[in-house]
A protein has these predicted regions:
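Cleavable N-terminal export/targeting peptides
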Residues: 1-42
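Short loop/turn motifs that connect adjacent beta-strands in outer-membrane beta-barrel proteins
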Residues: 54-67, 80, 94-107, 133-140, ...
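Hydrophobic, lipid-facing positions within transmembrane beta-strands of outer-membrane proteins
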Residues: 68-70, 84-86, 122-126, 220-224, ...
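Sequence/structural signature of outer-membrane beta-barrel proteins
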Residues: 91-95, 113-119, 133, 147-151, ...
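Extracellular loop and loop/strand-boundary signature of outer-membrane beta-barrel proteins
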Residues: 112-113, 207-212, 295-299, 336-342, ...
Length: 508
């Protein structure tokens, strides 16, 4: 632990010393107020709504010029174990003589991330975001992402994924209903004898189901997007293109050393039995009337190339994108994948969502923001990769929402736990700032965040109802570092599981 703290301190000092900018605050509160008022005399090249102007306290705390932020990332989750990595950000705010200084969190942002997990997962990404590029109404965004996850989660597709976890205990033969995930997973990992040729298994071999809900997933992604603002910056029209190359490797019949010997309880080697992905794929191939893959035209068993044309229409009155305290964000986003977009698949995706932010206490009592999000996603097509069903793509700078479960959706449920053709999601948070300070020229603001997540998947719009909605409460902590970098710690508990996350960025 001391070594980790030492490495963190060295990294922090190096980042701090790289700043050319002096202290954030100019001097007295009166001087700061005078500078903010002077900003009103600067002329924008086009009209911007006053709703888009940053709050006075955000302007006072905003840095000028170029600066860098970043942190080593140490996380632990039940899927990947310990993850070690780093996220680095390079920002340019220009100075207070730039009229856009008072309307945007940054003029340029470069971001880089690299993470390596105990389970072998690797993530690397490069991003660039330039609002009001060349002092115009246009915004440019670019992304390059590589990821490989040997434990990518798959629990099926359709409303049947809403069923509570159940399993047959390999030791007693009893059926366990309403299981919690740790016990469910432990039972999968236990060894068992082969079930015979009817199941494609050798009765003389020792098998396990430890990877039943997992696939070995990899992706290369290149995405480019342009946005243009209308109505004094409130409306944004987005047009983008994305190429995504997906690799899928199944665990069926592979020897794994992650099995647990049913007699000794020790880790041992065994042959992986049929996975959930293969079972669903074969049911679709055989024309099973109950197969979700056959009913919904699901494909992508071996991965493939996905070419996407993306469009989005957004109404945005938030005051500060990375950490809003007021305003709303409304969005309709659409993705089209077809042969003419360079894709091996044929589908369309739609997302409608709204995010709302409102300060609920007087300024004298501190900054407390009530934040909420409501989202509805839909996917249809003649050949839909199963991986796309588990992603609600969004046109905004925040990107899509992996559904349903995990760090950005239902935080108390396993990642990818619920997936359907129609997805509904709601999140409510109370972001209450309780302390802020400046350390080594770095502005830090801390907030406590109780939250509630709710969601459900459906096979079609005609099936929509309010029964069997999945809910989890939770508590979190936020650190806003120089306003534009948000560190998030969340703990959530559900009927199935309890999970902790330490990641960058608000949930929404």
């Amino acid at each position: 632990m001391r070594r980790i703290i030492l490495l963190f301190t060295i990294f922090f000092v190096l980042i701090t010393e790289s700043q050319a900018q002096e202290a954030v605050f100019l001097g007295t509160e009166e001087v700061d107020r005078a500078v903010i008022i002077a900003g009103d005399t600067l002329t924008l090249p086009f009209d911007m709504s006053r709703e888009k102007r940053l709050l006075p306290e955000d302007i006072r705390n905003k840095r000028e010029g170029w600066y860098a932020t970043g942190l080593p990332e140490l996380t632990v989750d039940p899927i990947r174990g310990l993850t070690v990595g780093a996220n680095a950000f390079l920002f340019n705010n220009n100075d207070r003589t730039d009229p856009f200084y008072y309307f945007t969190p940054y003029r340029i942002r470069y971001a880089m991330g690299l993470r390596v997990a105990q389970n072998g997962r690797i993530d690397a990404e490069l991003n660039v975001d330039v609002p009001f590029i060349f002092n115009s109404k246009w915004r440019f965004r670019g992304d390059f992402i590589y990821a490989n996850d040997p434990n990518w989660q798959y629990f099926g597709i359709g409303s049947q994924t809403l069923n509570n976890l159940r399993y047959q205990d390999k030791r007693t033969g009893n059926i366990v209903e309403n299981a919690r995930f740790p016990q469910y997973y432990e039972n999968l990992a236990l060894t068992r004898p082969g079930r015979g040729p009817a199941f494609g298994e050798d009765p003389n071999e020792t098998y396990t189901d430890v990877h039943f809900n997992e696939v070995d997933y990899s992706q290369f992604l290149l995405g480019l997007a342009l946005e243009r603002t209308f109505f004094e910056g409130r409306m944004r029209l987005m047009l983008g293109a994305e190429i995504l190359v997906i690799g899928i490797e199944q665990y069926d019949k592979r020897t794994t050393v992650e099995a647990i010997d049913i007699n000794t309880g020790e880790e041992t080697g065994a042959v992986q039995g049929q996975t959930r992905l293969t079972r669903d794929f074969l049911a679709g191939q055989q024309g099973d009337a109950n197969s979700s893959w056959a009913r919904f035209n699901i494909g992508g068993y071996n991965g493939g190339r996905i070419g996407l044309l993306q469009t989005g229409l957004m109404w945005d009155t938030r005051d500060l994108e990375p950490d809003p305290s007021r305003g709303m964000f409304l969005e309709y986003a659409q993705e089209i994948s077809a042969t003419w977009t360079g894709s091996e698949f044929d589908f369309t995706k739609h997302l409608v969502q709204g995010m709302f932010y409102q300060r609920v206490l007087p300024n004298s009592l501190g900054r407390t923001v009530f934040a909420s999000r409501f989202a509805l996603g839909y996917i249809r097509g003649n050949n839909i990769p199963f991986t796309e069903v588990l992603d609600l793509w969004g046109a905004s700078e925040g990107g899509g929402i992996p559904v349903l479960g995990g760090a950005r959706a239902l935080r108390g449920y396993r990642e990818g736990r619920f997936a359907g053709m129609v997805t509904a999601l709601a999140n409510i948070e109370l972001r209450s700032r309780f302390y802020q300070t400046t350390i080594m020229n770095q502005h830090m603001a801390f907030s406590a965040v109780p939250f509630l997540d709710a969601g459900r998947v459906y096979d079609s719009f005609g099936d929509m109802s309010l029964d069997n909605i999945k809910v989890n409460p939770g508590i979190g902590l936020r650190l806003a570092w120089n306003q534009a970098t948000i560190l998030r710690m969340d703990y959530a508990r559900s009927a199935e599981d309890a999970q902790f996350f330490f990641v960058f960025g608000h949930t929404f």
